[in-house]
Amino acid sequence: MPNTNPVAAWKALKEGNERFVAGRPQHPSQSVDHRAGLAAGQKPTAVIFGCADSRVAAEIIFDQGLGDMFVVRTAGHVIDSAVLGSIEYAVTVLNVPLIVVLGHDSCGAVNAALAAINDGTLPGGYVRDVVERVAPSVLLGRRDGLSRVDEFEQRHVHETVAILMARSSAISERIAGGSLAIVGVTYQLDDGRAVLRDHIGNIGEEV
């Protein structure tokens, strides 16, 4: 899956997910020759910024292979300077045309943030930092009348997209110029489907 443009990149990921959902993955970009060729450098087509949940393995659910995607994962897809730097590297140095924010259902980080807001239950250690970074999305969702857990999970994806735009001029400038797009996706654990929830920039379709 070579470097292309936002529309082609999103199309390739959608088609890969459709193969995965149907149980007909092609496992591309995994041959011995392809692996050896990557030693000279990488040209991924998409950045996946997703949750670190073990059930949400990006290369598998989008049926991609070695060198196809630049993957950054944190619990609850929370953002810090290291995340921003990693994504900006992919965008500015590798010229990746698409960023995918990948959330999912049954997200422990979102559920923990809901528990913290509802009854004051906060975990210890650095897990607390993760929960505190997710909590603003939950509070914004509650302000807007959301009540179901899946609604809060989708809202957190939306807010993550917005934060990337607001905090990184490298991202926002390339989106304005048309060379980059961001999509927000939620992954459904039971059927394996990656559902488009949000996007900024042209990806060839609307939500």
UniProtKB/Swiss-Prot annotation:
Inhibited by sulfonamides and sulfamates. Signal peptide: none annotated. Active at pH 8.4 and inactive at pH 7.5. Zn(2+) binds at C51, D53, H104, C107. Binds 1 zinc ion per subunit. Its cofactor is Zn(2+). Gene3D superfamilies: Carbonic anhydrase (3.40.1050.10). One of its GO terms (molecular function) is zinc ion binding. Keywords: Lyase, Metal-binding, Zinc. Belongs to the beta-class carbonic anhydrase family. This is Carbonic anhydrase 2. It comes from Mycobacterium tuberculosis (strain ATCC 25618 / H37Rv).
